[in-house]
Amino acid sequence: MGKRGFAGLKGADMAGLKEEDSELLARIDAWFEAHRQNIIEDIKRMVRIPSISKPTEGDAIEKEGPFGTGCRQAMDEMLSIAREHGFFTENGEYYVGTIGLEKKNYDNTIGFWNHLDVVPVGEGWTRPPFEPYINDGFLIGRGVQDNKGPAVGMIYLMQCIRELGIGMKHELCLFVGCDEERGMEDIAYYTSKYETPAISLIADSGFPVCYGEKGIVEGQLLSNDSLKKPVQSVWGGSASNMIPDRAYARLDYSEKLLNELESLNEKRKAEGGTEVAVRVQDEACIEVEACGTSRHSAFPDGSVNAIHELAVFLGQADGLGVENTAVFATLAGIASEYYGRTEGIDFQDEVSGHTTCAATVLSTENGKMCVNLNIRYAITQDSEELLRRLEAFAGENGLTWRLERDSKPNYFPKEHPAVEYLTRLYNEWQGLDTEAFVMGGGTYARMLPRAFAYGIGGMPKNDEDREREARLFKKGSGGAHEPDEGLNLRMYFEAMKFYTLAVAGLDKLELSSFVMGKPI
C-alpha cells in the first residue's frame, strides 16, 4: 500500500487529501468492497473469451464481425454485463460499443475508453491463458491487466457514482473497442462515422497522467535474396508489439550439420550463454529453437530477444554457407539492441526520452528472411527522416524496407487544467511528487480528439506485493503481454476507488477548457 493508500482500511490515513475528498473516498471504498466479488467474476467472464483481433473480409464480416469471432463474442458479453447493471448499450457494428445513457449529449460527456481485444498468448503459461484463476491475491489470465480488468472496472465506476448519488454535471460514457492491439482500425472506423465525447480518458496506462505518446512506425526488413539450402525456414514471435520469447529455424538434415550445431551449443553453454535446443524432427529436418524473455516492445528493458539469440547461433554455423550466415549476422545486429543505433535512427528528446526499435516477428516470405520492426519514436523526431534512414540502412545491407504504418505522436498540453488537476490529486493521495509523463506505449488517445491516457496501472507496490510477485512469477512473466499475465487485486481495487474519486473531481471543471493539444 502506498503512503496514502486505503484499500481494505476503514478510516484510513488520507491526510494528503482535502476533508471532502477523504469523506467521499471512504464512501467509494465501502461501495467497491461490497461489490468486490461481483467485479472479479465479471472480469473472469471477459477473460474466458479468446478475443485476439483477426480482421475479416467480405461475407465473413456479417457472421464474425470485423475482427473475428472472439472479438465479436467479447463485445456481446461486455454489453450484456453493462445491461445487467442498468446501462443502455449500443453496438457500433462490432467496432466500438458504447455504455451509458440512452440519450447522449457528447458535447457534455466525459468518455472512458478501453479495449476488449488481447495480444496472442505466446508460450510459457503455467495454466491455460483463458481459464482465469486467483493465486495469492493475483487474478491470472490473458487480458486481466490489458485491458479487460480496467474495462469492467469502468462499468462499476459509473454504477458507483450513480448509486452513491454523486451529483455530476457531465454525462459519463464508456467506449469499448476490439482492435487496439493490432492496429486501431476500430477507432479509425468509429470516429469516421460517430461522435466522440468532449474529453476522453483512456484507462490503459499508468498514474498520474500520460499526456503524450511517442509515434509508432511498423514495417518489415526483407532480404533481397532467398535463403539458401540447407535453411528451409525461420520464424518467431506472435505479435508486432511483443519482444519474442521463442524463435525457430528448420534446416535440411545432415549428420555433419547436426554435429556442428551440437558442438556450437556446447561451446555456447560453456561460455555462459543460454542453451539453444537442437532437435532432429525426422531424417529430413533439424529444428533449432532459441528462447528469450518477453516484454512489451515499447518497454523493452529487461527482455531477451529470442530472434537475436537464434540469429547469433545460426550466424556461427559454417555448415549453413556464407550467404546464409551473412544474412543471420545482419539479423543479429538488427535484433541486438532496442534504441535504433544499428539502423541509424537513434534519437532522444527531453519530452519523451529515447526512440526504441525492436525486432518482434521473424518469418520466411517466399523463401526470403523477413523481420518486423516495431519503432516508438520520440515526439520531436522527424519521422520522414527516420524512414529515409531505414531505407538507406536496408539498401546498404541487402534488404528492402517495407513500411506498414506511421502513427504520429499524440501530445496533450501538460499545463492543461485536467492534467494538472489529476496529477495534483494523485500526489495528494499518495503523498508523492510525481509528474505527468510521456510513454512509448500506444493507446486510443492517439486516435481521438481531446484525449489522454490515465490509469489504472503504475500503483506503488509494497513489500508484500513484491514478495508475492517473486513467489508467483518467473522472470518474463506476470506482466501485460507476458505469460501468466496477472492482476494484483489489492492494487486494482485501490486504483479503481481512486479513479472514481478523480472522475468526481474532474466533473467540477468546465468542459469548455478541454482543448486538444497538437503534436509538437
Where are these regions (language model features)?
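Acidic/histidine-rich catalytic neighborhood of metal-dependent amide-processing enzymes
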Residues: 147-226, 262, 339-350, 514-520
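Active-site metal-coordination/substrate-binding segment of hydrolases
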Residues: 107-176, 182, 194, 471-494
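A generic structural motif
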Residues: 97-99, 249, 284-291, 370-373, ...
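Acidic/His- and Gly-rich active-site-bordering loop/insert found
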Residues: 11-140, 164-168, 463
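An extended, acidic, His-containing surface patch that forms the Zn2+-binding/catalytic region
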Residues: 294, 298-366, 379-385, 400-520
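Predominant activation on well-ordered alpha-helical scaffold segments within soluble catalytic domains
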Residues: 44, 79, 152-159, 188, ...
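Acidic-enriched catalytic cores of C-N bond-cleaving enzymes acting on peptides and small amides
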Residues: 211-222, 226-235, 240-293, 297-360, ...
